[in-house]
């Protein structure tokens, strides 16, 4: 590990602007995990340059050039960033202005960041450009498609509003999430609003919901499917035109969940899909399991409960053609 700083001071300069010259900070072979074992592993080398400036409302100009020689997947406790390169300005009011900072990710993806963070007013306004970014830029799991588009983050630093518009080439998604804050009680709720997933020629999914980030952590999620074709998202998923809705509620702190599903006339793998389900679960107890699903000649029906003494769960399955469910299934049951 090596860390050094260098600057030049001119104590007899004519102006404050000229008293402190360029400040150079260099670091090499820095591994966060060496300082705290729970931190991710990396080998960081960086050059940071700052130039004090006391004219035109600017207090500090700077740049950062950081490289990570041991970039790796986040799910292996590495940092999935290869390089960060860009410039910034801090004005005399404490506002940080970011000018096109580029973030090189693990594989082929990159993120461009610009905007401002106003520390005095507790406000931020950031624009992120997403370029050719895939799941393999972050984790080991490989998910089809690479994203291009934009993410905008603005509002209070503790409760920002996030809008996105992203396209994978065969599907696009847009939507908004924000944090609703009760400042008196110090409680925050995460809200999902107008979330859409739209495959090319594959219908769409719409979702909205909320998650309380305090006490019992109450959850509510509503999903509506309109002629949705799962195969347009991933070729390994079954072809179809799915219409229906899912309503999920829960209390995470109590491991308590309830869900309802209703299919309107739909198709999956070339045969009709219909039915409904009503399920309730609490702390390892399936208290309600009402399902009545039909996929072609396959029928699945359940009713009852499971998990406690005296419970009885009735299951009636007729599945002469398992291939209709996809996922490589075949035969009969």
Regions found by a protein language model. Give the residues of each.
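Interface amphipathic segments
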Residues: 1-333
């Amino acid at each position: 590990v090596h860390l050094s700083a260098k600057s030049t001071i001119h104590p007899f300069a004519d102006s404050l602007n000229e008293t402190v010259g360029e400040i150079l900070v260099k670091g090499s072979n820095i591994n966060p995990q060496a300082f705290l074992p729970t931190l991710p592993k990396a080998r960081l080398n960086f050059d940071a340059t700052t130039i004090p400036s006391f004219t035109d409302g600017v207090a500090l100009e700077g740049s950062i050039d950081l490289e990570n020689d041991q970039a790796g997947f986040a799910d292996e406790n590495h940092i999935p960033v290869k390089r960060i390169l860009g410039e910034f300005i801090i004005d005399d009011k404490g506002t940080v202005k970011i000018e096109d900072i580029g973030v090189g990710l693990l594989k082929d993806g990159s993120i461009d960041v610009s905007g401002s963070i106003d520390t005095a007013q507790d406000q931020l306004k950031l624009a992120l450009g997403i370029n050719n970014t895939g799941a393999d830029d972050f984790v080991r799991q490989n998910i089809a498609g690479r994203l291009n588009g934009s993410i905008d983050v603005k509002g209070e630093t503790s409760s920002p509003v996030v809008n996105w518009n992203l396209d994978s080439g065969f599907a696009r998604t847009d939507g908004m999430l924000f944090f609703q804050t009760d400042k008196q009680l110090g409680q925050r709720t995460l809200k999902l609003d107008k979330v859409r997933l739209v495959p090319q020629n594959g219908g769409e999914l719409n979702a909205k919901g909320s998650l309380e980030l305090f006490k019992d952590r109450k959850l509510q999620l509503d999903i509506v499917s309109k002629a949705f074709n799962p195969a347009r998202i991933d070729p390994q998923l079954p072809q179809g035109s799915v219409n229906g809705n899912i309503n999920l509620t829960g209390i995470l702190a109590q491991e308590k969940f309830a869900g309802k599903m209703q299919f309107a006339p739909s198709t999956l793998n070339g045969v009709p899909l219909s039915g409904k389900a009503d399920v309730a679960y609490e702390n390892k107890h399936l208290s309600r399991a009402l399902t009545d699903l039909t996929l072609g000649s396959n029928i699945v029906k359940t009713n009852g409960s499971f998990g406690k003494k005296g419970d009885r769960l009735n299951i009636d399955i007729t599945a002469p053609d398992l291939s209709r469910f996809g996922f490589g299934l075949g035969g009969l049951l």
